[in-house]
Amino acid sequence: MPRICAGPPSRGTPRWVKIWIAVWKNRLKPYDLLSKDEVNTIHEQAMTILEEIGVDFLHDGARELFEKAGMRVEENRVRFERAFVLEQVARAPATFELQARNASRTVTLGGDNVVTAPVYGPPFVTDLERGRRGATIEDFTNFDKMSQAVEQIHCAGGTTVEPEDLPLGTRHLDMVYSHLRWTDKPFMGSVISTEGARDTIEMASIALGGRDKIEKTPAIISLINVNSPLRYDDRMLGALFEYSQAGQPVIVTPFLMAGAMSPMGLAGTVAQQTAEALAGIALVQLIRPGTPSVYGSFLTNTDMQSGSPAFGTPESAMGILASAQMARHYKLPFRGGGALTSSKAPDAQAAYESMMCMWPTILGRVNFVLHAAGWLESALLASYEKFIIDVEQLRMFEWILGHGLPVDEEGLAMDALREVGPGGHFLGAEHTMRHYRTGFYRPWISSTENFDRWQRFGSRTTEVVAAERWKQLLAEYPDPGIDPGVDEELKTFIARRKTEIGADA
């Protein structure tokens, strides 16, 4: 639940000013891009796709479960009965808790809750001084520490960057350890393999009090990507089985670039996405009924001149809104949106493309916002400065959701209107004196000073200020600590698993 900042309010703080620092509640009315008839039309097409075309599952266990449930299975292809799909999807809870190592950081997904997480997946990182380079485990840990340090990030994320200085076969152990040691927030599990998922579950069990405890209240959320169009590969399905059997939430996310991996028509793309997501969620429920399942969306268009994905486009924005509406139709928590951009630098393009994705994220009532901070270059690049700039944007949305527009005695300020009257000004009014410190949003890095003052203090651009801020965050990082016995048990487990896997795997 959201918390009001601890301690007494500062002098002049009105009762209606709330500082939301744990998780967001989005009480804005969701924006419906589609009519009810259009939602039903897309639903019908999704069901037709599942019935007539089907979905490939490159995993023996998945096909066996579907065949046992009465679905038509031919080689890798599974064709579904719509009643079966809808029955299974209805087993997934509309809301669920995701526990953190620190109980006060536990979050709720679904409903009007908004949970944010940083960038996921880039093999490269950049900062103002060192430029673009391959990511390392030091970078990974730094992003964990920055995520811990800012209240606007609620989940530490998963593969914030790919630490290329570590062996591929064992790096997931170091990454999960970083999440558990340097943050006390919820985190995302490894999906690189069946074994990676199994190791994640074991490490979370060590850190959070045992397998029984995390099965009772989930502690790991994982990102299961569909190999669109209409195919699940064995690696993702192996991870899906492990997490589902343990009752850990999965975000089933088709990766759709309209024009390449889905039709040019955006409505057809949303229908394909719905079919793919519901097929995966049906499998999760077959494995363990009631396992939390999230309808995920990663939908944008292809630049038809270059073949590259394009982010922060009108299609991205409409895709977020339409996808969120479909998730609400099935009463499922929804993942989508984020501060997405195709820009290679934290520049004006990055800013307007990110905002083009973040506004529909908020208006569409997205529940889990992956890539909320740090994303550049179509997910190839994580930027220290972009992380900070995105957090400023998150702070603004946090203010809108937490502060709102109070229509009460203080918000209407009739006393100030009477005091000032025609032709006056409100700078010295009693109402202004009560609220001037806390009544408006105060920027974290943005400049609102006049030109002379800005020039006198170095004419610093936003990127320069952001570089100073991330260094300050790391220098002042609030270490959450960890029980020494738990830490030792985690390190022992990691050492054993690295020996079993092989250091050069």
Predicted features along the sequence, with ranges:
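N-terminal leader/transition segments
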Residues: 11-12, 18-127, 469
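Short acidic (Asp/Glu) and glycine-rich catalytic loops that position anionic groups and cofactors
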Residues: 21-26, 67-70, 219, 257, ...
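Glycine-rich anion/phosphate-binding loop at the beta-strand->alpha-helix junction
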Residues: 223-393
